[in-house]
C-alpha cells in the first residue's frame, strides 16, 4: 500500500545584489530584474519543490550570473529561511516550529522576526505585536540540563561551572535525595564552552550539561507605540536552538493574525549556503509572496 506523506514547506527568501555594466546590455533595469527573478524561479523548478532536494547557493548564483554573461559582473545573495504555522485563536497554547536547518544567531540589525498578530498585553490592552529575537552581545549560560539526578543527597551540593567565560553560578534543587533541577543564579559572560561539576551534599552520581547562549537564544513579543518606539510585551516568549533551527513558543493566546491565509511567518537567515531537505520537508520559493525575491542592481 502506497504511503501518502503530507509535506511541510521550508520557504526561502532570496535577496540578491547584482553588479552589472549598463553599457554592455540593451535591457532596462526593470527587464534585467525580471530576468533575474525568472532565473531564480527556474532554479527552484529545476532543483527544489520536491522531497530530498538540496539548495546550493553557489549554483543559484550561477543561474543569476548567466542571465546576461556579457553585462553582469557578479552577484551576492542573502538567503533567509521561513516557516509558517497556523495558530489557535482565542486559546492559550504553546508551539514548536522546526526549521530543520541551522540558523544564524541574530544581531541588532539582522535577527529572527515574524509577521504581525494581536495579543493582549499585561494591562489588558490589545496590541498589534510580533515575535523578535533578542540580540545578545555576549554568551552566558542559558540552561543547565540534569542528565543523571544521582541519589543520596541530604543537603544541597555545590555546583561549579568551569569554562572560558566568567561569573556563572547555579544552585541545585533536591527532591527526595535526587537533583530535580539546577537553577541558574548568574548567567555569566563570554562563554563559548563550559562544563559543570556537582560536589558535596552527601550524594553521588549526579551529572549535568551546560547549554550556552551560542547554541540558544530567546524570543520576545513586542509592539511599536504611537511614537514608533519598541515596547516589550513578553521578554521570554520562546526559545531558539540555532543548531537545529527549532523554535519553541511559550504559552500564548493569539487573538487575530495579520495575514489573509491565517498563518504566522517566522523568518531567519540561514547559517549555511547548502540546505538539505529532511524528512517530509519540501524546500521552495513562494513566487506569490512579494518579499520572496528581491534584487538590487548596481551599475558600474
Language model: regions and residue ranges:
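Conserved, function-critical positions that sit in or immediately flank catalytic
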Residues: 133-218
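Surface-exposed interaction regions enriched in Ser/Thr/Asp/Glu
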Residues: 137-139, 191-200, 213-219, 226-300
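A glycine-rich phosphate-binding loop feature that marks nucleotide/adenosyl-phosphate handling sites
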Residues: 6-13, 53-62, 80-86
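C-terminal extracytoplasmic interaction modules
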Residues: 94-136
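Flexible glycine-/small-residue-rich
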Residues: 16-22, 99-101, 268-270
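Short, well-structured beta-strand/strand-turn elements
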Residues: 67-82
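Carbohydrate-recognition loop of C-type lectin domains
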Residues: 1-51
Amino acid at each position: 500500500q502506497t504511503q501518502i506523506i503530507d509535506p511541510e514547506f521550508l520557504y526561502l527568501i532570496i535577496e540578491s545584489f547584482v553588479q552589472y555594466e549598463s553599457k554592455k546590455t540593451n535591457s532596462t533595469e526593470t527587464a534585467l530584474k525580471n530576468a533575474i527573478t525568472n532565473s531564480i524561479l527556474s532554479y527552484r523548478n529545476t532543483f527544489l519543490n520536491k522531497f530530498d532536494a538540496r539548495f546550493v547557493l553557489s549554483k543559484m548564483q550561477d543561474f543569476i550570473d548567466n542571465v546576461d554573461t556579457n553585462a553582469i559582473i557578479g552577484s551576492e545573495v542573502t538567503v533567509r529561511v521561513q516557516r509558517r504555522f497556523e495558530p489557535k485563536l482565542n486559546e492559550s497554547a504553546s508551539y514548536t516550529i522546526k526549521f530543520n536547518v541551522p540558523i544564524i544567531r541574530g544581531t541588532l540589525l539582522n535577527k529572527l522576526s515574524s509577521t504581525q498578530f494581536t495579543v493582549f498585553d499585561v494591562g489588558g490592552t490589545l496590541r498589534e505585536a510580533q515575535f523578535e529575537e533578542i540580540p545578545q552581545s555576549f554568551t552566558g549560560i542559558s540552561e543547565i540540563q540534569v542528565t543523571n539526578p544521582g541519589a543520596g543527597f541530604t543537603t544541597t551540593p555545590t555546583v561549579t561551572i568551569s569554562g572560558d567565560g566568567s561569573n556563572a553560578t547555579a544552585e541545585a534543587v533536591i527532591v527526595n535525595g535526587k537533583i530535580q533541577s539546577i537553577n541558574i543564579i548568574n548567567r555569566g559572560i563570554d562563554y563559548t564552552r563550559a562544563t559543570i561539576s556537582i560536589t558535596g551534599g552527601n550524594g553521588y552520581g549526579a551529572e549535568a550539561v551546560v547549554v550556552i547562549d551560542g547554541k540558544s537564544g530567546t524570543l520576545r513579543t513586542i509592539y511599536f507605540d504611537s511614537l514608533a518606539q519598541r515596547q516589550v510585551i513578553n521578554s521570554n516568549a520562546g526559545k531558539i536552538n540555532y543548531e537545529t533551527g527549532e523554535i519553541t513558543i511559550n504559552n500564548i493566546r493569539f487573538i487575530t493574525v495579520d495575514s489573509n491565509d491565517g498563518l504566522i511567518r517566522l523568518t531567519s537567515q540561514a547559517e549555511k549556503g547548502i540546505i538539505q531537505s529532511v524528512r517530509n520537508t519540501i524546500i521552495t520559493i513562494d513566487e506569490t509572496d512579494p518579499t520572496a525575491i528581491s534584487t538590487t542592481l548596481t551599475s558600474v
